[in-house]
Every structure is written in C-alpha cells, then in structure tokens.
Amino acid sequence: MAGRRSSNVFPLSGNSGGGLEVDTPTWLSSQAATSRLMVRPSMGPGICPGPEVWGVPLGSSPYEFRGGIAPYRACEARAWSQSSSEDTCPGPYIALRYMPNLALPEDVSAIQKEMEQLAKELRQKRMTLGYSQADVGFAVGAMFGKVLSQTTICRFEAQQLSLANMWKLRPLLKMWLEEVDEKNLLGICRMEMILEQARKRRRASRERRIGSNLEKLFLQCPEPTPQQISYIAGRLRLQKDLVQVWFSNRSQMGSWPTNDTSRREDVGATGSPFPGPPVCFPMAPGLHFDFTHYEGSCLTPLYSSTPFPVRGALLSAPTTTLGLPRLSS
C-alpha cells in the first residue's frame, strides 16, 4: 500500500536494522516552536494519509531531521520541510504526524464558538461512554503521549480555561474524540484496554499496601480482640470478616523465617498505616479500650499514613516477599 514519508526523514546509514519498541506515543518538539511531531507505533502495511503524516519503517537507528538528529525517544529537533514524496510502508512502521503549534487566529469569536462546541461534545461523549474525567486524561496520555489531569478536563468542559489554553488542548481532545467515535470500534477497544490495565495496576498497588499494613499490625498484635479487629477494619475500610480471616490465616503460617526482632524494629521505623495522631494499640486481650483516651500499656504508637479505600477488592500482599494469603470478599 502507498504511504507518505517526509523527504528529509530517513534512517541514518551504517546502522543495523531491528525491532524498535515504542510503548507510548512520543512528542518531538521543534526548537522553532512552530510545529511538533507525534510518534505513534503502528503495524503495516498501511496508509499514512495526507501531507502531515509520514510512515517511517521500524529500525533501531534514530531518524535525521533537517538540522539535527532525533532518536525515537522524546527530544528536540529543528524545523523541517513539509514536502513529502510517495513511498511505501512495507511492514511495521512508525507514523510521524505533523502537529502545528499555531497561535490563536485573529477571529476570536469563531474560536470561542468552536471551543464551546468542543467542550460540549467532549462532555457528552465522555458521559455517553461512561468515562470519568480522570479516565479521559489518562487515556489521552496513553494514546498521544501527554497526560491531562482530571482538573484540566473538568475546567475544559466547564470552559474555565483561558481561550489560549483551550486552543492548545484542542488537537489532543479532538484526536481522542476521533479515537472513541462509535464507528471506530478499534479505538473504543483500545480505550477499554488502557483503562482496564490502569485499574489492575491501581488495584494491585492498593492490595500490596493493605497487606503490608496488616502485616505491621500482626507483628504488634498477633491475636487481636474483636474490638481491635473492628477498629482495624474501620481504619483500613475493610470488612471485619476479611480482617478476622486474614489474621487467622496469618497466625497459621507461623513466624517469619527471618529474625523477628529485626522485623519489629522495621515496623517501628516505618510507622503505622493509620491516619491521624499517635494511637496506642492495646495488647492485652479482652481489655476494654478507647483509642483516644486509653491509659493502659501499649506498644509503639501508630502514626499517620494514607488511608486506602477498598470496596470489595481482593486482599493480598506480594507472595514473593510477604507470603500472605489472598482473601476475597
């Protein structure tokens, strides 16, 4: 199939070929501040339509732009010619897309209307597909190499950004809208895969933190009372049954093969999973206690840390390091 490749974009001679791994699209910015390139991996043969998109064959070598060399990672490159010649993308290739970085046009009123329409379209499409503003910002980063915060998407939809800033975000958000168009099933599937991977990473990270927090508490109190279990469950936002089963399974595993004294010292040094001021954790089973006014004996005070909201998630700690049982609600 025919494709387009810039006449001044070519592999440097003297370098061996090979695969080129590009995990996410990469922005190549111009020192002339007039334009930029977006590098997107793709599989060919394929068509790179229009004079603003060029197909570059995959290879281990960097590519040379007029006035400088630009590897496939983010870097600076000087301005280049927009002229292009017919060429072929024979196999896997990278699509280099020319992204103009233009100032605001003189017709401000027309731009305001366009931005209003784009903001409404973005909000409508996002809500129709059931995505949060944070989902959109993360997906834009995964797809096009520039992560947008939830606040940025929120202010764009509410048209609370300056016109200049909204104009700068316009190309990215329009590309995202094109990607998730109802006719573009591949783009929608790609969006779902990106968000699912992000959810898995967040869930795994949360599970590791919860397992670590429970392990710290276990080293301080291997056999907590029902009142203590209720307190732990409330602070970690877990079900009491899950906490009770975790402590029961952890007790059956026995002590760690390493020195227990060093483990306890590590727990004291790292602090507690609970937020708020220092709290005395009572150790004597069956004692009535009040965490804010308890005057009995206690071990190391528990100091603040970030709470972890968990709603029915699987609980586990890394089996390679903690060897903790995996629980489910």
Swiss-Prot record:
InterPro entries, alphabetized: HD, Homeodomain-like_sf, Lambda_DNA-bd_dom_sf, POU, POU_dom, POU_domain_TF
Domain of life: Eukaryota
Cellular component GO terms, alphabetical: nucleus
POU-specific domain boundaries: 107-181
Subcellular location(s) of the protein: Nucleus
Principal cellular location given in the protein's record: nucleus
Gene3D superfamilies named among the record's database cross-references: Homeodomain-like, lambda repressor-like DNA-binding domains
GO MF: DNA-binding transcription factor activity; sequence-specific DNA binding
Family: Belongs to the POU transcription factor family. Class-5 subfamily.
Its biological purpose: Transcription factor that binds preferentially to the octamer motif (5'-ATGTTAAT-3'). May exert a regulatory function in meiotic events that are required for terminal differentiation of male germ cell.
Residue stretches of biased makeup (Polar residues): 1-14
Source organism: Mus musculus (Mouse)
CDD domains for this protein: homeodomain
Residue numbers spanned by region Disordered: 1-24
Record-given protein name: POU domain, class 5, transcription factor 2
Record's keyword terms, sorted: DNA-binding, Homeobox, Nucleus, Transcription, Transcription regulation
Pfam families reported in the protein's UniProt record: Homeodomain (PF00046), Pou (PF00157)
Annotated DNA-binding residue span(s): 199-258
Tissue expression remark: In adult brain, expressed in the olfactory bulb, becoming specifically concentrated in the mitral cell layer. Also found in the pyramidal cell layer of the hippocampus, in the granule cell layer of the cerebellum and in the cortex.
